[in-house]
Amino acid sequence: MKRIAVLTSGGDAPGMNAAIRAVVRKAISEGMEVYGINQGYYGMVTGDIFPLDANSVGDTINRGGTFLRSARYPEFAELEGQLKGIEQLKKHGIEGVVVIGGDGSYHGAMRLTEHGFPAVGLPGTIDNDIVGTDYTIGFDTAVATAVENLDRLRDTSASHNRTFVVEVMGRNAGDIALWSGIAAGADQIIVPEEEFNIDEVVSNVRAGYAAGKHHQIIVLAEGVMSGDEFAKTMKAAGDDSDLRVTNLGHLLRGGSPTARDRVLASRMGAYAVQLLKEGRGGLAVGVHNEEMVESPILGLAEEGALFSLTDEGKIVVNNPHKADLRLAALNRDLANQSSK
C-alpha cells in the first residue's frame, strides 16, 4: 500500500491532532504518501481530499480539536453515499484510510470494509464508550478538564454552603462522571450503568450537612437525565439545600490534550499505519493492559459488542460496554457523609 488517507469524524476529542500527526509521519517514514480528508465522510463524498506532508502536521500535537475538522454525515449510511466516497478515494489513488472517531465513525469504516476498501479505526471520543479498547483518545483530557472545573466549583460551593449538581458528558456511559467524581472528591456520583434512588440521594445530602459539611457536589452523567431535571427531581423528593446546577457540556471536548492522550494517540496512529502497510484493513486499534491490540471492526460496530482478550492474544467480541462500577462503590466508601 503506497497511498493512504486519514479523516476525523463525529464529535471532536483532544488528541485527534496527535493521532493525525502520527499517521502522517509514520506513513512518510514507511515510504507512503498521505492525504487528508476534510470534514470526515462528508469530505470523502464531496472530494475534499488533499495531500499532507510532515510540515502539514507541525505544531499540532499540542492542539485540541482536529485541524482536519469534523462533521456528522448521516448520508454515508446509505449505499449511494458509500459508493461515492469510495469512488473519490480511488480517484485520488488512495488504497486505505484511517478513520478517527466514535461508534458512528466506526460504522462508516465498517461500510468501507464491507465494500472491500481497507479501513482502520482509531477510537477518538471523550466518552470512553468504544468497545475494543481500555481507553479512547480524548478521555483522559476530558476527565482532567472536568476535575479542574469541579475543583473550582468546590471553592464557590464551600463559600456559600451550597449543593452543586454538575452534569458531565458521556452519552450513555458513566466513565467521565466516575473518574472525575472520584478525583474531585464528589459526594455522590450518578451514572447510567447503576440504578439510583432519589430519596437516598436526598437523604445523603441531608446527612452530610447534619454531620457538618459546608458544601456538597453531585456529579451526574448526562445519560441519566439533565442536571436541571435531576435538581427538580431532588426538590420534589424534599431536598431543602441551596441547590445549583452546572453543565460542563462541550467544555470537556476542548483544550490542549494531556500527555497521556498525546502518547496514546501517537501510538495508535503509528499502529494503524503499520496495519495498512501490511494490507490489513477492517480493523480497529485499541489499547489493552497498555499494549496495542486490533479488533475486527465488523464486530465492534455492532450494537452491544465488547472485546475480551484470550490467552492467545485474540479478540473476542461479546458483551456491551460497561463502566467500571467498582469505582462507584469506591466513591461511596470515600465520600463518607460523616466527614467534611
From Swiss-Prot:
The reaction(s) this protein catalyses: beta-D-fructose 6-phosphate + ATP = beta-D-fructose 1,6-bisphosphate + ADP + H(+)
Pathway linked to the protein: Carbohydrate degradation; glycolysis; D-glyceraldehyde 3-phosphate and glycerone phosphate from D-glucose: step 3/4
UniProt KW Metal-binding keyword: yes
SUPFAM superfamilies (UniProt xref): Phosphofructokinase
Gene Ontology annotations of biological process type: canonical glycolysis; fructose 1,6-bisphosphate metabolic process; fructose 6-phosphate metabolic process
Residues given in the record as Mg(2+) binding sites: D103
Gene3D superfamilies (UniProt xref): 3.40.50.450, Phosphofructokinase domain
Binding partners and assembly: Homotetramer.
Annotated family: Belongs to the phosphofructokinase type A (PFKA) family. ATP-dependent PFK group I subfamily. Prokaryotic clade 'B1' sub-subfamily.
NCBIfam families registered for this protein in UniProt: PFKA_ATP, PRK03202.1
Function: Catalyzes the phosphorylation of D-fructose 6-phosphate to fructose 1,6-bisphosphate by ATP, the first committing step of glycolysis.
Stated name of the protein: ATP-dependent 6-phosphofructokinase
Gene name of the record: pfkA
